[in-house]
């Protein structure tokens, strides 16, 4: 019975592209909202949809607009990314000037970010699309070469573009982290761009889920001492939390 309902929900989401909990209650009047929320959570864990505020969005729709690699990456460790994104979103205040990268964790941040008057600079196409739903957020999308794996842009003209621009906060996510190599990514141009954007910010918040620990990418863009706040999940090792805290870094 449960599996049949879950499959029906998945089919509805694929057919409509997006569906709200209110609409699901109309289709399943005898099922509680809490149960429907759990069904959506299970479907997201199975990689069949993406939960959004108040409902869910079709993976097929995301693949059409965002590319298959990005759609798959978005659902890897989705629970951890959602938790981290929500924590980071709580730190955004009215009037803030923020840079947010284009990683899949950043998409969850964008979904949870409050709709308050602020200015957001981003290299993420999907991030900008999500933020565009918020009436009070001013969005600056940096152009350049598109990285299809995370739908973010990189460009050699970033220094000129950001020459006279400063941020209160840079919110960055890493593809890999070790204590020896720091935070790293797979693109030299992206690494140089992230170093620049870090330098333009008063505070740097790093979003890092525990699955990235122990991985090394070719290009380091930040070391432990370069960040102010680490935002992570419950599985993050206590020994590493102690290391970050010993360097006066806030761990969330």
Tell me what each language-model feature is.
Residues 94-98, 115-119, 226-229:
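Short active-site oxyanion
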Residues 2-7, 15-23, 27-30, 34-35, ...:
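HTH-adjacent hinge/linker in prokaryotic transcriptional regulators
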Residues 102-104:
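Short, well-ordered beta-to-alpha junction loops that form the rim of enzyme active sites
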